[in-house]
Amino acid sequence: MKGQETRGFQSEVKQLLHLMIHSLYSNKEIFLRELISNASDAADKLRFRALSNPDLYEGDGELRVRVSFDKDKRTLTISDNGVGMTRDEVIDHLGTIAKSGTKSFLESLGSDQAKDSQLIGQFGVGFYSAFIVADKVTVRTRAAGEKPENGVFWESAGEGEYTVADITKEDRGTEITLHLREGEDEFLDDWRVRSIISKYSDHIALPVEIEKREEKDGETVISWEKINKAQALWTRNKSEITDEEYKEFYKHIAHDFNDPLTWSHNRVEGKQEYTSLLYIPSQAPWDMWNRDHKHGLKLYVQRVFIMDDAEQFMPNYLRFVRGLIDSSDLPLNVSREILQDSTVTRNLRNALTKRVLQMLEKLAKDDAEKYQTFWQQFGLVLKEGPAEDFANQEAIAKLLRFASTYTDSSAQTVSLEDYVSRMKEGQEKIYYITADSYAAAKSSPHLELLRKKGIEVLLLSDRIDEWMMNYLTEFDGKPFQSVSKVDESLEKLADEVDESAKEAEKALTPFIDRVKALLGERVKDVRLTHRLTDTPAIVSTDADEMSTQMAKLFAAAGQKVPEVKYIFELNPDHVLVKRAADTEDEAKFSEWVELLLDQALLAERGTLEDPNLFIRRMNQLLVS
């Protein structure tokens, strides 16, 4: 060996190895799935590169994975004749984890072994899973197209460092040898290894072969026996594929240890010819909100792998969807740039988007419990849909779930169809309120009249909700109405005011004028309202005015926030309003009005510019 050097692992690798060995040991056989899956990916990459450079096959175009073991040496070897790696690639791929957010991901792991196991599996351990059962791993590899003397040797005990060196390797591809730990003899058993390969690799298009040794005429004859079906799962007839095979294929392409929630396998012929296999995961990826999070489908053209993470086939609000598309209409030399401007891509994207929305609608209809799992994991992402995809807005709206005054629970389980089915006779609008929290929404004074009338209100408390409702203007022909904005339909709901009450209100006109004079430009208007039952005052905004929640969103994003001018509404039947109206002393009157306004602002915004002044004012009035 030449050019030998010992290097230290990236700190995150050391941490991941330690956590992984302890968290995944109960499911240790998955190392074989991960290593065979990597070998399959290496074959896919070679096929793709060989489209433009057939010489990379080096006269050996029969791609396969081989598994062998040596009971005496206690080693298990997985080899492929795929694309292989250069020295730099070995250091990059086997010595570091090139994923943004790795550090924060590792910090999120705790003492819950079952949960950590799911997260680590989701992270994609790949090659490192070998250390679950091995106390030393040796890699010999040579990149396709390189000379034999440009082979690379890599070895590590999975602790703090690894050794890398130059070697001569005649055949292209990668060979990984696991030196098994004491007690891992099951992976030296022919039947056990065969059963694992059958379980995890039937769906892989690449032949997976196991070494077969037979004694003939006093000599040991070595042959290779294919274990898996070696037919791409998505090319098979749906009726021939078991649920277990679909689940294992998902784990192979998504590098996820969890079963998917649901899937859809379709072959389309006619104007466009393609096959799609789309999965909805059961758990959100750990880095879903990371700006660099990779998403998209695996793209095949006429069964030839082209690229991972082809995000052009799925809108951003469906970025959680995993799976693949195999198209007959795209060229084999397609690039990401060509995909961006392709009519074929746009048509496929539209068709696949509709397919996913139909899949989710079916899941919601057939299995409400599973759909609730989906909503808890991906609901916030789906809420981006109404703004992004106007063409499918109604279909997306059907999939949304909300908390509401009907259920009296913070769980988001109410669909818009549920709400519409319960609308009161003569009710024309879908009422909702946005707030910082479920508790704030539920206790808002804006709900008082609607509660009294038995009218349901949707309680929205996710940060994205206010933004979403700017785009989601109606459902089933019924407009949405924020109860914190002034609206004629809300005033109509108020009880009919009798003549004596009208006379009493007329008598309050001078009081309203005094309040207007005192507050001046600080409010847009001052008026009496019959929308309140228990609260003395509220602030609301005009229909065309920026809402409180939208102003908060702007502020959180560091943008300049235009001043929100509120309408100050007073309840003429409330004792505090009557007391203020009866106060002749201007200083005391000012204190009462300011207190009522601060209370209304606090209920609306959750904060005050000067909370200490509010407390002093309230204390003074309490003791006066």
From Swiss-Prot:
Give the signal peptide as a residue range, or say none if absent: none
Protein's recorded name: Chaperone protein HtpG
Which Pfam families does the annotation name? HATPase_c_3 (PF13589), HSP90 (PF00183)
HAMAP family this protein is in?
HSP90 (MF_00505)
Q: Subcellular location, in the record's words? A: Cytoplasm
- Region (B) spans which residues? 337-552
Give the CDD domains listed for this entry.
Answer: HATPase_Hsp90-like (cd16927)
Describe its function. Answer: Molecular chaperone. Has ATPase activity.
Source organism per UniProt: Escherichia coli O139:H28 (strain E24377A / ETEC)
Q: Which family does it belong to?
A: Belongs to the heat shock protein 90 family.
Looking at the record, which segments are called C? 553-624
GO molecular function terms attached to this record: ATP binding; ATP hydrolysis activity; ATP-dependent protein folding chaperone; unfolded protein binding
Region annotation (A) maps to 1-336
Q: How does it assemble?
A: Homodimer.
CC terms in the record's Gene Ontology section = cytoplasm
Q: Which keywords appear in this protein's UniProt record, sorted alphabetically?
A: ATP-binding, Chaperone, Cytoplasm, Nucleotide-binding, Stress response
